[in-house]
Amino acid sequence: MTASTSVAVGCAVGIPVGVGIIIAVCFWFNLQKRYKREEQDDRELERAIYDESGFVSFDNFGPLRDSKDEAALASSELKNPDHTSGSSEGSAHPEEKDGKSRDQEKPLGKKNSKYYVPAYRRKINLLQVRNNNYGNNARQKSVVDLPSINNSSNVSLSSSQRHITKRQISVYDQMVPVISDEGPNFFADPSSDTNTSNDQNKASMIELKHNTRQSSNENLIRNLQNQDFGSYYPRRASSSFLNGNISNASFHTRNSSITSVNKRDALEDVFATPKSAAQSQLPNTFDKDNEGMDADHSVKDSRSAITDKDKDLYKLQNNYDVGNIGEIAEEDQYENEFTNYSQSKREFIESLRPK
Protein backbone atom coordinates (compact mmCIF):
# COMPACT_ATOMS: atom_id res chain seq x y z
CA MET A 1 0.00 0.00 0.00
CA THR A 2 2.80 2.35 0.90
CA ALA A 3 4.73 1.40 -2.24
CA SER A 4 1.83 2.22 -4.47
CA THR A 5 1.36 5.55 -2.70
CA SER A 6 5.01 6.53 -3.14
CA VAL A 7 4.93 5.55 -6.78
CA ALA A 8 1.79 7.56 -7.34
CA VAL A 9 3.24 10.62 -5.63
CA GLY A 10 6.51 10.26 -7.52
CA CYS A 11 4.73 10.01 -10.82
CA ALA A 12 2.42 12.90 -10.00
CA VAL A 13 5.34 15.15 -9.09
CA GLY A 14 8.19 13.81 -11.20
CA ILE A 15 6.47 13.60 -14.55
CA PRO A 16 5.37 17.29 -14.70
CA VAL A 17 8.74 18.44 -13.38
CA GLY A 18 10.57 16.33 -15.95
CA VAL A 19 8.38 17.60 -18.77
CA GLY A 20 8.90 21.19 -17.62
CA ILE A 21 12.68 20.70 -17.52
CA ILE A 22 12.67 19.24 -21.02
CA ILE A 23 10.59 22.15 -22.34
CA ALA A 24 12.86 24.65 -20.61
CA VAL A 25 15.95 23.03 -22.16
CA CYS A 26 14.35 23.20 -25.60
CA PHE A 27 13.51 26.88 -25.15
CA TRP A 28 17.03 27.55 -23.92
CA PHE A 29 18.57 25.94 -27.00
CA ASN A 30 16.27 27.94 -29.28
CA LEU A 31 17.14 31.12 -27.42
CA GLN A 32 20.86 30.44 -27.76
CA LYS A 33 20.46 29.91 -31.49
CA ARG A 34 18.56 33.17 -31.76
CA TYR A 35 21.25 34.99 -29.79
CA LYS A 36 23.97 33.62 -32.06
CA ARG A 37 22.04 34.63 -35.16
CA GLU A 38 21.43 38.12 -33.79
CA GLU A 39 25.09 38.48 -32.89
CA GLN A 40 26.03 37.57 -36.44
CA ASP A 41 23.53 40.09 -37.79
CA ASP A 42 24.92 42.74 -35.46
CA ARG A 43 28.44 42.06 -36.68
CA GLU A 44 27.28 42.43 -40.27
CA LEU A 45 25.49 45.63 -39.34
CA GLU A 46 28.61 47.05 -37.72
CA ARG A 47 30.69 46.09 -40.73
CA ALA A 48 28.19 47.82 -43.01
CA ILE A 49 28.12 50.92 -40.81
CA TYR A 50 31.88 51.27 -40.51
CA ASP A 51 32.37 50.72 -44.24
CA GLU A 52 33.11 54.29 -45.39
CA SER A 53 32.70 53.52 -49.09
CA GLY A 54 29.25 52.02 -48.63
CA PHE A 55 27.44 54.76 -46.72
CA VAL A 56 29.52 57.94 -46.84
CA SER A 57 29.21 58.56 -50.57
CA PHE A 58 27.08 60.39 -53.09
CA ASP A 59 26.67 57.49 -55.52
CA ASN A 60 24.53 55.15 -53.44
CA PHE A 61 21.17 56.72 -54.30
CA GLY A 62 20.56 54.14 -57.04
CA PRO A 63 20.10 51.21 -54.65
CA LEU A 64 17.31 53.10 -52.88
CA ARG A 65 14.97 52.56 -55.83
CA ASP A 66 12.06 50.16 -55.70
CA SER A 67 12.75 46.46 -56.09
CA LYS A 68 10.28 46.22 -59.01
CA ASP A 69 12.11 48.93 -60.93
CA GLU A 70 15.37 47.17 -60.09
CA ALA A 71 14.09 43.87 -61.46
CA ALA A 72 12.72 45.55 -64.59
CA LEU A 73 16.04 47.29 -65.21
CA ALA A 74 17.99 44.06 -64.74
CA SER A 75 15.65 42.14 -67.07
CA SER A 76 15.87 44.85 -69.74
CA GLU A 77 19.65 44.79 -69.58
CA LEU A 78 19.70 41.02 -69.89
CA LYS A 79 17.19 40.93 -72.75
CA ASN A 80 19.18 43.39 -74.88
CA PRO A 81 21.96 41.45 -76.66
CA ASP A 82 25.48 42.80 -76.48
CA HIS A 83 26.76 43.34 -80.02
CA THR A 84 30.28 44.23 -79.01
CA SER A 85 31.03 40.95 -77.26
CA GLY A 86 32.49 38.03 -79.14
CA SER A 87 31.36 35.40 -76.65
CA SER A 88 28.37 33.13 -76.91
CA GLU A 89 26.39 34.96 -74.23
CA GLY A 90 25.05 37.47 -76.73
CA SER A 91 23.39 34.67 -78.75
CA ALA A 92 21.86 32.92 -75.75
CA HIS A 93 18.17 32.08 -75.70
CA PRO A 94 15.89 34.66 -74.01
CA GLU A 95 14.40 32.01 -71.74
CA GLU A 96 17.79 31.41 -70.14
CA LYS A 97 18.15 35.13 -69.47
CA ASP A 98 14.65 35.24 -68.02
CA GLY A 99 15.65 32.43 -65.70
CA LYS A 100 18.72 34.35 -64.62
CA SER A 101 16.63 37.45 -64.02
CA ARG A 102 14.22 35.45 -61.88
CA ASP A 103 17.15 34.12 -59.89
CA GLN A 104 18.32 37.68 -59.34
CA GLU A 105 14.83 38.84 -58.36
CA LYS A 106 14.60 36.31 -55.55
CA PRO A 107 17.25 37.83 -53.24
CA LEU A 108 15.72 41.29 -53.75
CA GLY A 109 12.29 40.20 -52.61
CA LYS A 110 11.18 39.87 -49.05
CA LYS A 111 12.07 36.61 -47.43
CA ASN A 112 9.52 35.01 -45.15
CA SER A 113 11.03 34.41 -41.74
CA LYS A 114 9.49 32.92 -38.65
CA TYR A 115 11.58 35.27 -36.46
CA TYR A 116 10.93 38.96 -36.02
CA VAL A 117 13.47 41.17 -37.79
CA PRO A 118 13.45 44.93 -37.07
CA ALA A 119 12.69 47.31 -39.91
CA TYR A 120 16.08 49.05 -39.82
CA ARG A 121 17.88 45.70 -40.00
CA ARG A 122 15.79 44.54 -42.94
CA LYS A 123 16.47 47.80 -44.75
CA ILE A 124 20.21 47.53 -44.15
CA ASN A 125 20.27 43.91 -45.30
CA LEU A 126 18.32 44.87 -48.42
CA LEU A 127 20.75 47.69 -49.18
CA GLN A 128 23.68 45.33 -48.70
CA VAL A 129 22.16 42.75 -51.07
CA ARG A 130 21.51 45.42 -53.68
CA ASN A 131 25.07 46.71 -53.44
CA ASN A 132 26.37 43.18 -53.92
CA ASN A 133 24.11 42.74 -56.96
CA TYR A 134 25.38 46.01 -58.40
CA GLY A 135 28.96 44.81 -57.97
CA ASN A 136 28.18 41.48 -59.62
CA ASN A 137 26.41 43.15 -62.54
CA ALA A 138 29.29 45.56 -63.05
CA ARG A 139 31.79 42.70 -62.92
CA GLN A 140 29.79 40.67 -65.45
CA LYS A 141 29.43 43.68 -67.72
CA SER A 142 33.16 44.33 -67.64
CA VAL A 143 33.83 40.69 -68.49
CA VAL A 144 31.36 40.77 -71.38
CA ASP A 145 32.83 43.97 -72.80
CA LEU A 146 36.33 42.57 -72.90
CA PRO A 147 37.67 41.48 -76.32
CA SER A 148 37.73 37.87 -77.31
CA ILE A 149 40.24 35.38 -76.02
CA ASN A 150 42.16 35.43 -79.30
CA ASN A 151 42.88 39.13 -78.90
CA SER A 152 43.60 38.87 -75.19
CA SER A 153 47.28 39.57 -75.77
CA ASN A 154 46.40 43.06 -77.04
CA VAL A 155 44.25 43.91 -74.06
CA SER A 156 45.83 46.53 -71.82
CA LEU A 157 45.08 47.66 -68.32
CA SER A 158 43.59 50.93 -69.50
CA SER A 159 41.01 49.19 -71.71
CA SER A 160 39.87 47.02 -68.83
CA GLN A 161 39.63 49.98 -66.49
CA ARG A 162 37.53 51.88 -69.03
CA HIS A 163 34.66 49.43 -68.63
CA ILE A 164 34.69 49.42 -64.84
CA THR A 165 31.92 51.44 -63.23
CA LYS A 166 32.55 54.74 -61.50
CA ARG A 167 34.21 54.31 -58.17
CA GLN A 168 32.49 55.46 -55.03
CA ILE A 169 33.64 58.60 -53.28
CA SER A 170 35.23 57.98 -49.91
CA VAL A 171 35.52 60.25 -46.90
CA TYR A 172 38.91 61.57 -47.95
CA ASP A 173 37.57 62.64 -51.35
CA GLN A 174 34.90 64.74 -49.66
CA MET A 175 37.33 66.78 -47.58
CA VAL A 176 37.75 70.39 -48.71
CA PRO A 177 41.42 71.40 -49.05
CA VAL A 178 42.44 74.68 -47.43
CA ILE A 179 45.41 76.51 -48.95
CA SER A 180 47.13 79.34 -47.10
CA ASP A 181 47.38 82.76 -48.74
CA GLU A 182 51.06 83.10 -48.00
CA GLY A 183 53.68 81.06 -49.77
CA PRO A 184 53.91 79.93 -53.40
CA ASN A 185 50.79 79.51 -55.49
CA PHE A 186 50.34 75.85 -56.41
CA PHE A 187 47.89 76.55 -59.23
CA ALA A 188 50.12 79.00 -61.08
CA ASP A 189 52.41 77.94 -63.91
CA PRO A 190 56.03 77.62 -62.80
CA SER A 191 58.22 80.34 -64.26
CA SER A 192 61.45 82.12 -63.51
CA ASP A 193 59.67 85.33 -62.50
CA THR A 194 57.96 83.84 -59.47
CA ASN A 195 61.03 84.10 -57.24
CA THR A 196 61.64 87.73 -58.16
CA SER A 197 57.97 88.64 -57.61
CA ASN A 198 58.00 86.94 -54.20
CA ASP A 199 61.14 88.86 -53.22
CA GLN A 200 59.56 92.13 -54.32
CA ASN A 201 56.40 91.39 -52.36
CA LYS A 202 58.41 90.58 -49.23
CA ALA A 203 60.45 93.78 -49.60
CA SER A 204 57.31 95.89 -50.03
CA MET A 205 55.70 94.29 -46.97
CA ILE A 206 58.79 94.95 -44.85
CA GLU A 207 58.93 98.58 -46.03
CA LEU A 208 55.24 99.07 -45.28
CA LYS A 209 55.62 97.67 -41.75
CA HIS A 210 58.66 99.91 -41.15
CA ASN A 211 56.77 103.01 -42.33
CA THR A 212 53.76 102.27 -40.14
CA ARG A 213 55.98 101.67 -37.10
CA GLN A 214 57.89 104.92 -37.72
CA SER A 215 54.68 106.93 -38.15
CA SER A 216 53.26 105.47 -34.92
CA ASN A 217 56.45 106.42 -33.06
CA GLU A 218 56.28 109.97 -34.43
CA ASN A 219 52.66 110.30 -33.32
CA LEU A 220 53.59 109.04 -29.85
CA ILE A 221 56.43 111.59 -29.51
CA ARG A 222 54.16 114.41 -30.72
CA ASN A 223 51.49 113.49 -28.18
CA LEU A 224 54.06 113.29 -25.39
CA GLN A 225 55.37 116.76 -26.23
CA ASN A 226 51.86 118.18 -26.10
CA GLN A 227 51.33 116.90 -22.55
CA ASP A 228 52.21 118.95 -19.48
CA PHE A 229 53.58 116.35 -17.09
CA GLY A 230 55.07 118.91 -14.68
CA SER A 231 51.84 120.36 -13.31
CA TYR A 232 51.09 118.91 -9.91
CA TYR A 233 47.38 119.74 -9.62
CA PRO A 234 46.22 120.71 -13.14
CA ARG A 235 43.23 123.05 -13.07
CA ARG A 236 42.94 123.44 -16.83
CA ALA A 237 43.92 121.68 -20.00
CA SER A 238 47.50 121.53 -21.19
CA SER A 239 48.77 125.02 -22.03
CA SER A 240 51.64 123.84 -24.19
CA PHE A 241 50.10 125.56 -27.20
CA LEU A 242 50.39 128.95 -25.46
CA ASN A 243 54.13 128.79 -25.03
CA GLY A 244 56.18 126.07 -26.69
CA ASN A 245 59.34 126.76 -24.67
CA ILE A 246 57.59 126.17 -21.37
CA SER A 247 56.04 122.91 -22.60
CA ASN A 248 59.45 121.61 -23.64
CA ALA A 249 60.88 122.53 -20.26
CA SER A 250 58.02 120.79 -18.48
CA PHE A 251 58.63 117.71 -20.62
CA HIS A 252 62.28 117.41 -19.63
CA THR A 253 62.25 118.47 -15.99
CA ARG A 254 60.07 118.58 -12.93
CA ASN A 255 60.54 122.32 -12.47
CA SER A 256 57.59 123.11 -14.73
CA SER A 257 55.56 123.92 -11.63
CA ILE A 258 57.90 126.89 -11.15
CA THR A 259 57.91 128.00 -14.79
CA SER A 260 54.17 127.60 -15.14
CA VAL A 261 53.72 130.63 -12.87
CA ASN A 262 55.68 132.78 -15.32
CA LYS A 263 53.48 131.92 -18.29
CA ARG A 264 52.44 134.96 -20.28
CA ASP A 265 48.77 135.86 -20.61
CA ALA A 266 47.70 132.93 -18.46
CA LEU A 267 43.95 133.00 -17.95
CA GLU A 268 42.71 132.60 -14.41
CA ASP A 269 40.50 129.62 -13.80
CA VAL A 270 37.22 130.60 -12.18
CA PHE A 271 36.63 127.11 -10.77
CA ALA A 272 40.06 126.89 -9.10
CA THR A 273 40.62 127.15 -5.35
CA PRO A 274 40.38 130.82 -4.25
CA LYS A 275 43.72 132.38 -3.41
CA SER A 276 44.48 134.47 -0.37
CA ALA A 277 43.61 138.16 -0.37
CA ALA A 278 47.26 139.12 -0.13
CA GLN A 279 47.93 137.90 -3.68
CA SER A 280 45.88 140.74 -5.16
CA GLN A 281 48.47 143.23 -3.85
CA LEU A 282 51.16 141.88 -6.21
CA PRO A 283 52.50 144.39 -8.78
CA ASN A 284 51.17 144.16 -12.30
CA THR A 285 54.67 144.20 -13.75
CA PHE A 286 55.14 140.57 -12.74
CA ASP A 287 53.72 139.19 -15.98
CA LYS A 288 55.93 141.25 -18.28
CA ASP A 289 58.39 139.44 -20.51
CA ASN A 290 61.34 141.79 -19.91
CA GLU A 291 61.61 140.88 -16.22
CA GLY A 292 63.84 137.93 -15.31
CA MET A 293 65.01 136.33 -12.13
CA ASP A 294 65.51 139.72 -10.46
CA ALA A 295 61.82 140.40 -10.78
CA ASP A 296 61.09 137.05 -9.18
CA HIS A 297 63.31 137.87 -6.19
CA SER A 298 61.68 141.29 -5.80
CA VAL A 299 58.24 139.69 -5.87
CA LYS A 300 59.32 137.23 -3.18
CA ASP A 301 60.62 140.07 -1.00
CA SER A 302 57.43 142.05 -1.41
CA ARG A 303 55.41 138.93 -0.67
CA SER A 304 57.33 138.27 2.55
CA ALA A 305 56.86 141.89 3.63
CA ILE A 306 53.14 141.75 3.04
CA THR A 307 52.78 138.50 4.95
CA ASP A 308 54.71 140.00 7.87
CA LYS A 309 52.28 142.91 8.01
CA ASP A 310 49.18 140.71 7.75
CA LYS A 311 50.00 137.89 10.14
CA ASP A 312 46.43 137.62 11.36
CA LEU A 313 45.22 136.97 7.78
CA TYR A 314 44.81 133.29 6.91
CA LYS A 315 46.96 132.28 3.95
CA LEU A 316 46.30 129.12 1.94
CA GLN A 317 49.53 127.16 1.47
CA ASN A 318 49.29 125.69 -2.00
CA ASN A 319 51.04 125.76 -5.35
CA TYR A 320 49.27 128.93 -6.43
CA ASP A 321 50.84 131.11 -3.74
CA VAL A 322 54.06 132.81 -4.73
CA GLY A 323 55.45 132.68 -1.21
CA ASN A 324 55.89 128.91 -1.20
CA ILE A 325 56.75 128.60 -4.85
CA GLY A 326 59.78 126.41 -4.14
CA GLU A 327 57.81 123.67 -2.39
CA ILE A 328 54.80 121.57 -3.19
CA ALA A 329 52.23 121.23 -0.44
CA GLU A 330 49.02 119.30 -0.52
CA GLU A 331 45.89 121.36 -0.23
CA ASP A 332 42.28 121.01 0.69
CA GLN A 333 40.26 122.23 -2.25
CA TYR A 334 37.32 123.08 -0.02
CA GLU A 335 39.30 125.10 2.56
CA ASN A 336 40.10 128.80 2.13
CA GLU A 337 39.97 132.01 4.13
CA PHE A 338 36.18 131.91 4.14
CA THR A 339 35.84 128.27 5.23
CA ASN A 340 38.65 127.64 7.70
CA TYR A 341 37.76 124.18 8.94
CA SER A 342 40.80 123.69 11.12
CA GLN A 343 40.25 126.99 12.97
CA SER A 344 36.54 126.26 13.40
CA LYS A 345 37.38 122.85 14.80
CA ARG A 346 39.84 124.38 17.20
CA GLU A 347 37.27 126.92 18.39
CA PHE A 348 34.68 124.17 18.83
CA ILE A 349 37.05 122.12 20.99
CA GLU A 350 37.87 125.18 23.07
CA SER A 351 34.17 125.82 23.59
CA LEU A 352 33.67 122.34 24.97
CA ARG A 353 36.21 122.83 27.73
CA PRO A 354 34.81 123.80 31.15
CA LYS A 355 35.20 127.45 32.02
Curated annotation (Swiss-Prot):
Native species: Saccharomyces cerevisiae (strain ATCC 204508 / S288c) (Baker's yeast)
Membrane side Cytoplasmic: residue ranges: 30-355
Gene: SKG1
Keyword match Transcription regulation: no
Name of this chain's protein: Suppressor of lethality of KEX2 GAS1 double null mutant protein 1
Subcellular compartments: Cell membrane; Bud membrane
Stretches of the chain found on the membrane's Extracellular side: 1-8
Lineage: Eukaryota, Fungi, Dikarya, Ascomycota, Saccharomycotina
Function comment: Plays a role in cell wall integrity. Affects the cell wall polymer composition in the growing region of the cell.
Disulfide bonds: none
